[in-house]
């Protein structure tokens, strides 16, 4: 027994002083070169350059490790004591929120809630920006926005919307579910839209009980199609909501048509294909057309057993 204890002690001692391993509370032994990577990203997140912070967030997002989650949370929080610091820029919070959704760690829930509450209180109903040809979120995996111009123009509204969507992808808690539902009646239309996205992403049918009533009172077209998309996407029934989504494919606003196309994919109904095919035949907005074609392929694939 004594020899066994001595062996274990020597093994632990040798492990602790190993020149190539460092102990970490979350992951145990971490190679020094790997720890150096995370230390470097910590340094970059603490910098005053939003582009450098964003790049550090991206690097931490795509590594198979939980070590970077708290650093991304730190980027989300920024520097509260220095409100004018570039570390608090909306673009940093936007990408930090998106990264936390991809990491999927529950320790991000409370920080996301706190930051969302703090930033969403000061938002107005709508930002009056001149629309440009390049309106719309870039990238096939992004949810559209009616006033997204480019990375330099990411607003706090967009950042708060991303926080809500990320909360929807994480396990719902009593507090997060309450906040998401409350956001459905927020004064800003994009926040209401993002709350609807979050409800859909959460995937819980029991959370849609009040959506029909909220839908009936919604006046903004973009928020309305987002709420309708969440409702129809969770129901997945060929009912009046399906018909309403199909009708929205004819809307004059290309952003609304794009959201309607996304809604049809969510419904997972092959009978949506002819309607989308007809919409594609007359669509003249290239971004919307690309989205519709991609959505049409997905709907067609539903027929394959």
What function would you assign to each model-found segment?
Residues 23-65, 91:
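N-terminal leader/linker segments that initiate helical-solenoid repeat arrays
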Residues 1-9:
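Bacterial N-terminal signal peptides that target proteins for export
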Residues 56, 96, 128, 160-163, ...:
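Conserved hydrophobic register position within alpha-solenoid helical repeats
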Residues 48-49, 80, 88-89, 119-121, ...:
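Short inter-helical turns and helix N-cap capping residues of alpha-solenoid HEAT/ARM repeat scaffolds
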Residues 53, 89, 93, 109, ...:
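Residue-level detector of extended alpha-helical repeat arrays and alpha-solenoid scaffolds
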Residues 10-19:
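Bacterial N-terminal signal peptides
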Residues 60-64, 100, 104, 167-172, ...:
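Alpha-solenoid repeat junctions
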Residues 31-43, 65-82, 105-127, 139-148, ...:
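Amphipathic alpha-helical scaffolding segments comprising HEAT/armadillo-like alpha-solenoid repeats
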């Amino acid at each position: 027994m004594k020899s066994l204890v001595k062996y274990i002690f020597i093994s632990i001692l040798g492990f602790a002083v190993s020149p190539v391993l460092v102990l970490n509370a979350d992951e145990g032994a971490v190679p020094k070169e790997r720890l150096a990577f995370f230390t470097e990203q910590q340094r970059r997140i603490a910098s005053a350059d939003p582009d450098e912070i964003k790049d550090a967030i991206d690097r931490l997002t795509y590594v198979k490790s939980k070590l970077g989650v708290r650093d991304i949370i730190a980027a989300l929080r920024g520097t509260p004591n220095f409100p004018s610091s570039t570390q608090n820029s909306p673009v940093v919070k936007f990408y930090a929120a998106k990264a936390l959704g991809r990491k999927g760690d529950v320790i991000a829930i409370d920080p996301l809630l706190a930051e969302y509450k703090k930033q969403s209180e000061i938002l107005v109903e709508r930002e009056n920006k001149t629309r440009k040809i390049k309106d719309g979120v870039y990238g096939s995996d992004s949810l559209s926005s009616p006033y997204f111009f480019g990375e330099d123009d990411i607003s706090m509204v967009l950042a708060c919307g991303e926080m809500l969507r990320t909360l929807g992808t994480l396990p719902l808690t009593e507090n997060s579910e309450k906040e998401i539902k409350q956001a459905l009646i927020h004064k800003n239309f994009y926040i209401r839209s993002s709350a609807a996205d979050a409800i859909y992403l959460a995937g819980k049918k029991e959370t849609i009980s009040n959506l029909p009533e909220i839908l009936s009172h919604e006046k903004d077209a973009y928020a309305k199609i987002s709420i309708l998309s969440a409702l129809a996407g969770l129901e997945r029934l060929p009912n009046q909501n399906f018909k309403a989504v199909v009708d929205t494919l004819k809307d004059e606003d290309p952003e609304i048509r794009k959201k309607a196309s996304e809604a049809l994919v969510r419904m997972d109904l092959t009978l949506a294909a002819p309607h989308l095919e007809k919409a594609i035949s007359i669509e003249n907005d290239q971004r919307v057309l690309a989205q519709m074609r991609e959505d049409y392929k997905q709907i067609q694939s539903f027929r394959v057993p």
